[in-house]
């Protein structure tokens, strides 16, 4: 590990440094909390606006954003609740910013109406959900219980994107990727973290700036569209409509109602409704192979498969490696980096016929359902390995596998 650049933390060390602006982290190696890595990734992605309300275990992201955003010329605001926080992101996005917030289960529930509005109005922003157990207030430890809510919690149709990081490095990398997805597809993106990865401290490597891919939304002026011919919800042969900011001179309709390409909401018809909602749904689902990310280990000749996502990946990989070292050479591993859109085609392209599929999740077994639908003709048995309130140990996973396929 190279030496940490201490000047990156000057604002913590002197009042003089705190008076000036300081840019994003310089390239190099750092030793950071997952929450801090998330904020630093957001800054490098171009985020300059954070609105939020504190909730354990997501408050550290808010605290770091409150410290760091003013240092890079950004804005931080603590809102009165999670409802206003999410709604504030909509306004900030249309003002031309790349906005974000962070919350946990109870707060995430309160944000669902704004998420639905953002899907319909095609407003890009990032919500980091540092998941905690539920229902209700549940507890403040680790969980993966909001994975279905991320996709289906908003009302109505439409689709969105959700990623699941497993390390401090991925809290940084996936935050940048999440902003890129939001900007490219004009959609809210959910980063499904959890208490474990948010509060762990690990090495973070910040690559050189020219190696960090940052995508910005396409504006109508980029395409040479005249002011008088601009239609707010017309893709113009692209994947999504170009998005101006307020003040750019274009007529902007921020519409939560079903609408025509020009933003008109008064000439309703079932045909118009179908066309509108189908487009905002299909722009994500029809490009699932382009958006989704998975990775596999030991898949050649695999007859028994362990699938995981998020921090559960860490225990699952260790369990697979331990069993393979003891002779279980037909045991493979598949990791879902993207949960939504669900990577069904990619999964089918990577695995063959299977005897057993094991799926450890920090919930009662949620993502095993779309996986079963995807591999219903490829696998005989689907075995959920649930755990609530804490990360699985590798031994828990090993025990279930041995119980099923023998010692």
Regions flagged by a language model, labelled:
Residues 10, 355-357, 361-407:
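Peripheral docking tails and interdomain loops at the edges
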Residues 33-37, 284-304, 317:
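Glycine-/acidic-rich phosphate or pyrophosphate-binding loops and their flanking alpha/beta elements
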Residues 313-350:
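Generic long, charged, amphipathic alpha-helical segments
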Residues 2-152, 159, 176, 379, ...:
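Thiamine diphosphate
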Residues 4-12, 189-295:
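Conformationally flexible catalytic loops at phosphate/diphosphate-handling active centers
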Residues 66-71, 279-283, 318-333, 376-378:
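Short helix-loop-beta junction
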Residues 141-195, 218-222:
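Conserved thiamine diphosphate
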């Amino acid at each position: 590990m190279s030496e940490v650049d201490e000047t990156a933390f000057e604002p913590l060390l002197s009042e003089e440094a705190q008076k000036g602006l300081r840019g994003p982290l310089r390239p190099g190696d750092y030793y950071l909390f997952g929450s801090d890595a998330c904020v630093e990734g957001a800054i490098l992605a171009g985020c300059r606006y954070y609105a939020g309300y504190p909730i354990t275990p997501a408050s550290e992201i808010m605290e770091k954003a409150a410290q760091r955003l003013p240092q890079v010329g950004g804005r931080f605001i603590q809102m009165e609740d999670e409802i206003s926080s999410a709604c504030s992101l909509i306004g900030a996005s249309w003002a031309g910013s790349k906005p974000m917030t962070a919350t946990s289960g109870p707060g995430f529930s309160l944000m669902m109406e704004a998420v639905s509005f953002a899907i319909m109005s095609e407003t890009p922003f990032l919500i980091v959900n540092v998941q905690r157990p539920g229902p209700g207030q549940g507890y403040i430890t680790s969980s993966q219980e909001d994975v279905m809510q991320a996709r289906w919690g908003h009302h109505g149709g439409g689709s969105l994107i959700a990623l699941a990081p497993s390390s401090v490095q991925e809290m940084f990398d996936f935050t940048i990727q999440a902003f890129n997805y939001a900007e490219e597809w004009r959609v809210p993106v959910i980063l499904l973290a959890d208490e474990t990865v948010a509060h762990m401290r690990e090495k973070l490597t910040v690559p050189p700036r020219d190696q960090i891919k940052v995508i910005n939304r396409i504006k109508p002026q980029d395409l040479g569209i005249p002011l008088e011919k601009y239609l707010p919800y017309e893709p113009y042969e692209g994947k999504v409509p170009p998005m101006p900011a307020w003040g750019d001179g274009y007529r902007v309709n921020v519409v939560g109602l079903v609408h025509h390409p020009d933003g008109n909401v008064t000439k309703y018809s079932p045909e118009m409704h179908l066309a509108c909602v189908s487009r905002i749904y299909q722009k994500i689902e029809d490009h699932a192979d382009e958006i989704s990310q998975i990775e596999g280990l030991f898949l050649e000749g695999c007859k028994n498969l362990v699938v995981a996502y998020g921090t559960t990946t860490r225990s699952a990989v260790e369990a697979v490696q331990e069993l393979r070292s003891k002779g279980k050479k037909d045991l493979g591993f598949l990791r879902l980096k993207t949960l939504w859109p669900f990577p069904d085609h990619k999964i089918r392209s990577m695995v063959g016929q299977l005897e057993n599929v094991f799926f450890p999740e920090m919930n009662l077994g949620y993502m095993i359902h779309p996986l079963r639908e995807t591999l219903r003709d490829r696998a005989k048995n689907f075995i959920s390995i649930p755990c609530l309130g804490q990360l699985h140990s590798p031994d828990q996973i090993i025990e279930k596998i041995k119980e099923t396929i023998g010692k």
